[in-house]
Every structure is written in structure tokens, then in C-alpha cells.
């Protein structure tokens, strides 16, 4: 029988805060954990060896919480997730980490974050290359439903999102990459991934068939095809979101990458190309490299397709 081991209100004192002043002293923190695990053997044997020792889980979490300073609750939560997946045979973890007495006068209770992740999703985060940091940072905005991954390559984003329960359609001109992506999805039993080899850069009057109001979200990472933007926006459902990141001209000027200047966005150009969307997030500047290496100059955008206003009768 599948089930969960639940640990509520595990409290400890740790150093977590954006400012050095907040980190200078410990503060009360708490975490709730839900650990998914197959409980059949333990139920039949009544033997601790066949289950997860929640006392050891609690001890490990407290050790990590007390022994490491963190600027953000998010980084502390990642430390917990990494250790628990590495050291205990859990299938999925859901946690709620919070400051019990945050230094915000208007907050009378707690402030915190929740994270839910499967073992497969954790493994995919460690692939090379891993999912883009920008996608991970904006994951809380990603609406549930159907996603289109444009220029998907070997599927670092598609496989990750499918492991979280998303239905992901992928397109890429590289037939070998698409074949590898399809094979990787089958090997991981990810039935929510579909693949299509498609050249999006054919000359006019070619119009790519990406659908009409089909997707809840569209991802484009490190691929720039300016004539494609109207088709991307058309393919979004009203209320759907575009997640976009690629190089700016500063990266070409500083690093000569990409080699061709036309493959880079000019300053503010991404906002012009997505003017019909409502901007939920935009940042242009130096960001961590998409392979986790040295920083690169990119523009990052999350844009929402508005619902059409109803006309008055």
C-alpha cells in the first residue's frame, strides 16, 4: 500500500535571512514533511527495517538546519530535499518550511515556502545540463496543464516538467535530439511527453502549425526566431504564459557568443516582441549560465496572455 510518513512541526533554531543582521542570530524555524513510501512490507512485518525511520529523518533535518546558514528558505529547503532523497528510500517529498517569528511587524504568525518533488524530478535536476535556473525560479507561476517546449533539444525541460505531471509537447528541428528525447521519456515511463521534428525557420510564406489557443504555457530557452513570436502567442490559451530566456547583445559583445549578432536580443527587444502579453516578470542582465557555468547576459520574461474583454451588449 502506498502511503505517507508525516512529520509535523519539527522545530529548530537556524540562521536564515537575506541580511547579515538577520543571519547573525538564530531564529525559530519549523518544517512539516510528507514522505511518500510503499508501506506494505512494514505493515506485514512490523519491522523498522522495512520502513523509514522518522526519528533519523528528523535528526538529519535538524542537523542540516542548525549546521548551515542560508540567505533564503528556498536554499535551505533544497538542502533538505537533496539529503532526504540521497539518504532515505522516499518516492516523493512535500515540505513546508517556515520562519515562526519573521522580522516583519505585520505578520502575526509565520512566513514560509512549500515544495513538492518526486525522486525522478530530483534526479532530472541533477542531469547535465539541468533545467534552467530561471525555469526553476519561476516554477511557482507555471500553470498546470499542457505545455509546449520549443527547441526542446534532448529534453532537459520537457522531462523535468513531465515528471511533475505536466503534459508536454516538444518540437525541435534536430531529429536525432527528438529521437533521444522520446527514448529518454520511455525509459523513465513518462507518458506525458510527445515529440515532433519540426523546422521552424523555413522561408515565407511558411506558417508553423503550433495550434490555436492550445497551451497553458510555452517555454523557449536559448532560441531566437523573431518571426515565430506571433505564432507562439496565438498558440497560448487566454490566461496562458510564455516563459522565455535567451542571450542579449551584451553576451555577443563580451564573449562573442553566439557568434552571429542577429541571434541575440537587443536591449528591451523581448518586451517589444511580446507587447500583447502582460508582463509578470522581466529581467535583463547577467545571469547564471544555462549549463550552470559562468554567468551570461540574457533577457528573461514571463508573460501572460490576457483574456479578451467581453463587449458590452
Walk through the language-model features, giving the residues of each.
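Conserved class I S-adenosyl-L-methionine
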Residues: 144-153
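Conserved SAM/SAH-binding beta-strand->alpha-helix loop
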Residues: 174-176
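Conserved beta-strand signature within the Rossmann-like core of class I S-adenosyl-L-methionine
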Residues: 240-251
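A short acidic, Gly/Pro-enriched loop at the edge of an enzyme's catalytic core
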Residues: 206-217
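N-terminal, polar/charged subdomain of small-to-medium soluble alpha/beta proteins
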Residues: 1-127, 137, 150
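Conserved SAM-binding strand-loop segment of SAM-dependent methyltransferases
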Residues: 189-202
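Core SAM-dependent methyltransferase catalytic element
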Residues: 285-313
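Conserved SAM-binding motif I beta-strand of class I
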Residues: 167-172
